[in-house]
Amino acid sequence: MSIHIVALGNEGDTFHQDNRPSGLIRTYLGRSPLVSGDESSLLLNAASTVARPVFTEYQASAFGNVKLVVHDCPVWDIFDSDWYTSRNLIGGADIIVIKYNVNDKFSFHEVKDNYIPVIKRALNSVPVIIAAVGTRQNEELPCTCPLCTSDRGSCVSTTEGIQLAKELGATYLELHSLDDFYIGKYFGGVLEYFMIQALNQKTSEKMKKRKMSNSFHGIRPPQLEQPEKMPVLKAEASHYNSDLNNLLFCCQCVDVVFYNPNLKKVVEAHKIVLCAVSHVFMLLFNVKSPTDIQDSSIIRTTQDLFAINRDTAFPGASHESSGNPPLRVIVKDALFCSCLSDILRFIYSGAFQWEELEEDIRKKLKDSGDVSNVIEKVKCILKTPGKINCLRNCKTYQARKPLWFYNTSLKFFLNKPMLADVVFEIQGTTVPAHRAILVARCEVMAAMFNGNYMEAKSVLIPVYGVSKETFLSFLEYLYTDSCCPAGIFQAMCLLICAEMYQVSRLQHICELFIITQLQSMPSRELASMNLDIVDLLKKAKFHHSDCLSTWLLHFIATNYLIFSQKPEFQDLSVEERSFVEKHRWPSNMYLKQLAEYRKYIHSRKCRCLVM
């Protein structure tokens, strides 16, 4: 017998005395007297083997002979990129633990607004524990105004934690530190209570099944075999960060050039990427005005570091293209300018690798004061208007998702004319876009804009065979690396669009979405739905979606009694029909045995255990 625990969220950086990373779950497993196995044997998937693991799996023995399996998911990426795995994790859990750091209010609200609704839909009457970890720092006096209580201070209040627990029907715990009292007696006591409850429930269900099997001593009914295992689709890893990083090195679609104070060319870049991470560049490139930003430090940083040069007498200006030459920007600070190529590489890589940036700057600037000065200027460039600079602790920021800037900020420019240099014409309407992002994220677009094609020199580009809604969803994926189709039909349209532009990862995402939607449908809904599953299969085959077409064939075979009654079942090819008949569930042999058993039961006037 086993117990499956899923732990979600990041309680903050905690360390053993020998500086090995630890946390709430690992500390409990290492200290609890009910859990056997030394600490080194608990970890199955070591974090060192993967750059940013989705989850860490632990296995141990509890209560002597009960297998304990724990999946610790410190980041929430799994809910953004992999519906299939996240749904299976939540659905298969016996106990769920949601943990957060009381001093990270931004992450708490991000989780509460974006991920808690997803978890609520996937919960299956399992106990949930909300663990608020840490001692509140710089906690302000509570405000009596009912309109601002939840936003007061920089810490997550007890009231907010309790409110979250009420939404999930969860047990709320405050763990001020990860010591023996809070881990062993407080958190451990509650967790072990729910573990015992889960064991009791599983034992009761097992006894009921055994009692039913022993209650009949006559001829046994035919055994219904399990359906064949469905093919498992593995999601393709994201290369979003590397796509944007490669854009800096390939120098395609450049629209801004930086010069040093001596008017010598330093590096080329792209306005859209710079504006996605920095309000300083938004102000510099007139995407936003000082009135929009209303932050004196950002305005001062822009004025102190950069100046735009539009002088026609500028060296090399006569050789620039007459169409739309790159914007010339003078970097006023000589030290900052000498490190600009490293700073841009840091920004294009996701703006989170602070240690690497500092190491690169130290190689160029020997004086530690100069290094600190340049690092502070980078932090000012990345500052959010109206807020205290949250990047002062680089180590804390480095623990965040590397795509934190791009995923949210590039969406700001989606279907907006700001900085747009290409316009798509679809179904009589226009959709503005940015060549740099399209070239970086889509090889077909890169070939189209850089080859000897009409689109390379044209601003207005017509798009055929795709609806506006589908194309906007396609662009949303290119800009943000994520998408959420409204349903199976839209997902298939998006899959076709992805195949047309050869974006394989988006195809896999659409395949997983369709599979997840179909798997979640009960039999009654499958029988009554208007979706033509055979037509879906033929489209998947036509557009080279081999994984989806294979899965759909198994799905039709597994639900044979439902789909064989539908008219479209006759549209299957001879080869497809043969496959379905071979792998059908329940099998034809079982149905014959069941008919004979029912005939015997009725002749004996016994009570049938199956029907």
UniProtKB/Swiss-Prot annotation:
Protein EC: 3.6.1.-
Keywords: ATP-binding, Golgi apparatus, Hydrolase, Nucleotide-binding, Repeat, Transport
GO biological process: male gonad development; proteasome-mediated ubiquitin-dependent protein catabolic process; regulation of proteolysis; retrograde transport, endosome to Golgi
Gene Ontology CC entries for this record: cytoplasm; cytosol; extracellular exosome; trans-Golgi network membrane
Location of the protein in the cell: Golgi apparatus
Annotated ranges, domain BTB: 254-356, 420-487
Cited function: Rab9-regulated ATPase required for endosome to Golgi transport. Involved in transport vesicle docking at the Golgi complex, possibly by participating in release M6PRBP1/TIP47 from vesicles to permit their efficient docking and fusion at the Golgi. Specifically binds Rab9, but not other Rab proteins. Has low intrinsic ATPase activity due to autoinhibition, which is relieved by Rab9.
PANTHER family (UniProt xref): SPECKLE-TYPE POZ PROTEIN (PTHR24413)
Protein name per its UniProtKB record: Rho-related BTB domain-containing protein 3
Gene name of the record: RHOBTB3
